[in-house]
């Protein structure tokens, strides 16, 4: 079951990166400006290391699924629904990079009606829940900290870019 989860997550991330590349091309044709280029490689690296850490911790420490695995899995699936709701709400404006088309209105539909950064909330929950599924507490704690640091930089950069270039 562990390898199936890893495979699903890797396929999901690869598909998202493909969509992000397509969306990047679309919005750059509309004049999108990229922000946060300096921290972007760290975000990619953190996500790769998250999976490697999870795999290493589960295998090397012989971690087994939590006795709460069914409930945790249900929450993870619910979080995925929110992820795709957020992505679909942004449409071509969704990206893994910070790309802002000057003069375009901020999206205020879907989960963006209630929350400024729902996809980041999803990532926070995933970094907590996925390791929790296999009791990989070291990965959960370390990468929650790494993610918090990176998101603090990322959200500031994104908010500044959106404030300067988007129509409110």
From Swiss-Prot:
Alphabetical keyword list: Cell membrane, Membrane, Transmembrane, Transmembrane helix
Topological relation to the membrane, as annotated: Multi-pass membrane protein
Cell membrane found in the keyword field: yes
One term of GO molecular function: protein C-terminal S-isoprenylcysteine carboxyl O-methyltransferase activity
Disulphides: none
Coiled coil: none
Domain of life: Bacteria
Major site of localization recorded for this protein: membrane
Record Pfam families: ICMT
Subcellular location: Cell membrane
Parts of the chain that traverse the membrane: 1-21, 41-61, 68-88, 123-143
Gene Ontology annotations for the cellular component aspect, listed alphabetically: plasma membrane
Protein name as annotated: Uncharacterized protein YpbQ
Organism this protein belongs to: Bacillus subtilis (strain 168)
């Amino acid at each position: 079951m562990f390898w199936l989860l890893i495979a699903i997550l890797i396929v999901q991330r690869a598909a998202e990166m493909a969509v992000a590349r397509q969306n990047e091309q679309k919005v750059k044709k509309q004049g999108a400006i990229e922000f946060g280029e300096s921290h972007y490689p760290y975000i990619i690296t953190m996500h790769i290391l998250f999976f490697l850490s999870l795999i290493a911790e589960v295998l090397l420490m012989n971690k087994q699924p939590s006795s709460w695995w069914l409930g945790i899995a249900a929450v993870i699936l619910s979080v995925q629904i929110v992820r795709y709701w957020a992505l679909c709400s942004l449409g071509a404006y969704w990206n893994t990079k910070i790309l802002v088309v000057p003069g375009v209105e901020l999206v205020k539909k879907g989960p963006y009606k209630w929350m400024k950064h729902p996809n980041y909330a999803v990532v926070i929950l995933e970094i907590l829940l996925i390791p929790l599924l296999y009791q990989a507490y070291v990965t959960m704690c370390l990468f929650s900290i790494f993610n918090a640091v990176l998101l603090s930089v990322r959200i500031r950069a994104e908010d500044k870019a959106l404030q300067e270039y988007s129509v409110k």
